[in-house]
Amino acid sequence: MTSDPTSSTAFVFAGGGSLGAIEVGMLRELVASGERPDCVVGASAGAINAAYFAGRPDEDGVAMLAALWCRIRRQDIMPFSMRSLVAMLLRNRPHLVEADALRLLLERNLPYRRIEQAALPLHIVATDVLNGREVVLSAGPVVDAVQASAAIPGVFPSVSIGGVELVDGGVANNTPISVAFALGVKRIVVLPAGFACALRVPPRSAIAHATHALTLVIARQLVRDLELYGARAQIHVVPPLCPLDVSSYDYSQCAQLIDKAAERTRAWIDAGGLAQCEIPGQLREHDHAAVLSH
């Protein structure tokens, strides 16, 4: 970070499963507009984006991150099978699948080994599985930290770091504005994944149901956090996509999500969005019978 944290900027990347692709479109336009953060903070899927961007914080790095998201398929991250379900039940295993596929993806694509080696100061949020306490990882092996932050409880195994068992950072703090604020940063740009506000039918699988419900809870919590910290810091929230009918469990539409988010973010920037500190209407409870004003 810069020597004067009160004049520095943090990018905060939220969790959101496959909707993390939306943040990449937002990031593309923020960087193209000249935004350069002094540090990055991320949780869950947002930890993947934060870690990758921290290693290559420029337009080429964003393009490479977008290409990565476009290659990802659900089986690359969550390789579910009947065999894995049977193994969980018969062996009394506390998780559905091993995290080998996710770990391999991270090892192949992150261009550095330790958090301290990133080009930007990087802070990854995870959750202590025993007490729900937020744990901020600002040093140590980056793959372990990101894997811990993305370890959905019950789906992936916890990750042991420093003798503490850690799971998904979204459990404790999915959009870690408070972490950026605690670092002394006074200008925060939030990249929220949003939620599928226009689904026509409920998600079909148990995990899709759970992840969708979590995104709804997260959006409500983000609004409360913005109300809490809005008077204490300069916070700019990039509006998420709305209406959105893509589940956070659906990885087949990442390219479209990136491009659409980039288009909407460019329009928001051109309209003076980075000069405003407002809570986007897309994050609040709404239906699509009414036209959102933001």
Language-model features, listed with the residues they occupy:
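Patatin-like phospholipase
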Residues: 1-43, 48-294
